[in-house]
């Protein structure tokens, strides 16, 4: 990394020849990605004078550095320093110190020993106060402390008499010390964006002041003593509430720039005309009704802006401003202009739009230098003929709709005045009907809205019409700015509040009820706490959210809407979010009366979201049901049931829909922030979003949810919490591990909170289905609390989840209760053997309810074999359980499950990557948890138990819960990085199995569960990058995880575990994975890949790691929001505390995704989604039959995306694509299936991890289609997490990943086997020469299959006699998998594009009828 360093050496020309040592005085190590100060620096400690270490990742300064006593300049901006060592006092010759953009909270007292220090730049650090010793730096001439947390300055600050520049912008200052009157040499003082209510009197003494900023404060008037600043040339007091400027200001004889914009002025002082040197006067955005006649005295003024006022006429004296170059008076009430303005001989730009002008004076023809004039939105009937003399005119705007700057004018005689005038077709002008509403800059800043807009701006790649409603408000700042400075004042305050809360929560989190509400400003924390308080509500919400999320998954457009709403209401997040969640839940479950108010809110919100985001119905075949999305929460239960099948089918189609540009956009947004919201269609999601909306962290988290289906929300909350060290999200796993443990030990209500959060997660993951019995629902609420207490180490959230599931499902799946095991304890399972208690977060994810209830439902499960198609575990658990719950409620759902299972049967032995399953199991396609492929892949109910060797012991046909337990044992078997994958998968399975297979070892789960929240993120980064690779969902998940991780930083890990079960699963991966963000995706991936178990195999929550296990498993220490990096400006920039970069400088490559996630992630998701969907669309080959099923449109796009992604992946990691370990099959299924976990995205995780990821079935499979995954994983971690892969992208990913895992042969006998009892599964390797030499038919939306018309599979129809496949394939062979990509339920065009894009070697898994 040091190759970039430059050595500036002062050399005597031939010194090297004379053998003399060179004298190194300057070293520049800027932008070298250094994590510590290079040791070679110390060899020059005697001569080194300047050291530049800008923009690295240095966390601490070694003591040796302070032996460089000749050092004059030390430049350390943009690093990860959290403290400035006291030994800095040794640098007695230090003159310039730059430590801006770090996480430094305070200066050491003995910095006073740096006597010659003249320049200190410490902006963008969370410095709350200056030490008294700081005022002893008597030689200080420049001090920059912008964007810190200063509330006051030392009383003896006036000792710094040599100060010339003092910048204190973006702090919380309310007053200045009186001793500052001694700073007579001060020339520049910047007090902008503070909290002053009046101009400090001490300013009167600063006689040397030349430039003074006091904008964006709370001033109400400008005192006359400002006039005593005779040297003042620049005065900016804009963006205040100034109602009056005293006349004394007129004595500032040297004033050149006076900025009074955005205040409440109704008049200007009459003496303003005496400011003879003013060149710029800005008085726009006030309430001026007239300009004083004395304004003509401003003879030097060149720019005068009085727009956005209430001026009705201009004084004739204004004609004396002969030097005027720019005049703006738009948005006033001018009816005419004084003819004197003709004397503005130097005017070049004249803005007069939006007035009431009916005529213009002839004298305007004398403005010979006029180049641009805007006259639109007036009442002009014509123009004076003298305009023909305006020879330099380049633009004359007469209408807002004008197509060209200059429109030809025609001569005409005015019928009234009989004068020659100019006119054209735009005259007479038509006044606007509606009043123009101007949004002033000083308008209060809405952090949630701003964040929403930022996210939207980050999703430009796939802008959809559905998203436009969310983007109505103009963006305030570019989303690409790393640290928007100055930060919006409200955001800054929010960060400060969060920091305070974090510190407070550190102490309170363990003891405090997670339900405790905070102030609105602490809404993020507040929300988390609220979650704790409103456990039952939260649970309800979760359910409804799960259902809704399923719907949203089905219709991404709706999902996206959800998110904006959630974001929009950060202030009321705690209550509103919960209420929304409960509302949604209620709608879905119909048995949660407790939260009726909330329900209503969330219903409306969701309805609004649904309206905003057009459902993807048109694209998906079964989408129509999905249309219900979040509009009818109360009908959700029924709707989801009926939708279950559709939803599952739609999952795939949704992905396809997502593929479409608009859909993609939705998906992308989902993957970003929207994606989370989408995942959480229901209010619960909103709750999570609200909680984290202010902190971008939520964005990532939600993405995880999308990808993993349930973890995302949890993750978001958890991360948020961990970051902020708040109780609010404790319910989920938000509390740090330690905190949670404390809560658990205390049997605190935190369980309730956890339950609440978990419920949310569950809902997000459609865990509602997990709840086995409606009867359990009321009971579960209580039970969850009880169980939480009982579990102790288990997560409080487990119970909550359980409640959620029960409530939501009124479920028939007792197994679902086992989901509580997600916490890592089967205790819960034991407690409620008959019902599955989904963990709030784990369960949601694990259940994969989003798939379809049928898949999860035990009855359906029966037929389902081991074909838990490669759904992402999250998806499986989420989609399957949740939707299943809904389906279960309907009862008929189970048949659907069977159907899905059947499809699964065909690909049964190919548990394949979840994505493959996705392709194969359309009915299961709905991924509540994952928005893309993973959802598509719903697992059948059949679940295979795997021994520690990853071998299925027996197929368990479980309604969904079974898959978890089976996998669980395997999982703990490989608790390493590989375990990440397997454990992730296992967790999912475990969640499902808890009930049926309480046998699963918690031990195995704990590792994977371990830092669940962290793992969610981590997985995305760490080994699970492989999982990420598995699918777009994984990518999304990884993204979210990554983002979460990024936001949370170290805290992320702790929070991760709080994520939903899937995420939790991810944690296992995480801990294996160093608990990197990749772990998130890893977990998700694992979850996805139930071993052959049902796609939706229910995974007993108990199988998940308990909180403690999760923690011990390697979860990174929970990070306080303020810990690590105390909310430096950069840290909190947009994300707020949760975004703390503190996570420790910059993450290693494995975890880089968390850090880089933002833009690159977005790009990736955007790119992949669009590409994948496009790939689908671009199946381009005739094989792709768009008609076949309504899916086709979306599928074709998805296929295109997949195709593109596959190409990328193959190009990047061709070697991985074909590798398919026998174990891999199972593994891929679990790993790949977790698209969310895969969210890590291929780039996030190194190929190695991809290649080996234990599946939940305990098998170790190569990472699903590592090449594809790798390409993303290997992309810089940043890129690695496509910020939020679109649903299509996820699907595509899944499909690609599925390819990675060889068919799951063991599950061979699963429901799929039912389809082809006499079939033999064969693995074939074909070398392209130059092509594959065979033709295929069939596929979803294909033209039909000549061999089995009722089968949507891909069949070989023709083999070239002498071609590469002539001796390997024969007509009638059904292709189950190719290079790890599942060909089950795949669209024809997609299959074609995949086969064509594969590199030379294509490894096929086919099913051949041995005896019919």
Swiss-Prot record:
Amino acid composition bias (Polar residues), ranges on this chain: 663-681, 817-835, 1075-1086, 1157-1171
Residue span, PDZ domain: 1321-1410
Keyword presence, Nuclease: no
Gene3D superfamilies: 2.30.42.10, Ribonuclease Inhibitor
Chain spans, region Disordered: 464-489, 506-542, 615-681, 803-867, 997-1021, 1075-1192
Basic and acidic residues bias (residue ranges): 470-480, 506-532, 632-641
GO MF annotation terms: ErbB-2 class receptor binding; signaling receptor binding; structural constituent of cytoskeleton
Cellular component terms (Gene Ontology): basal plasma membrane; basement membrane; basolateral plasma membrane; cell junction; cytoplasm; glutamatergic synapse; hemidesmosome; neuromuscular junction
Record's subcellular location: Cell junction, Hemidesmosome; Nucleus membrane; Basolateral cell membrane
Residue numbers of Phosphothreonine PTMs: 485, 917
Oligomer status and interactors: Interacts with ERBB2, BPAG1 and ITGB4. May favor the localization of ERBB2, by restricting its presence to the basolateral membrane of epithelial cells. Also found to interact with ARVCF and delta catenin. Interacts (via C-terminus) with DST Isoform 3 (via N-terminus). Interacts with NOD2 (via CARD domain).
Protein name (database record): Erbin
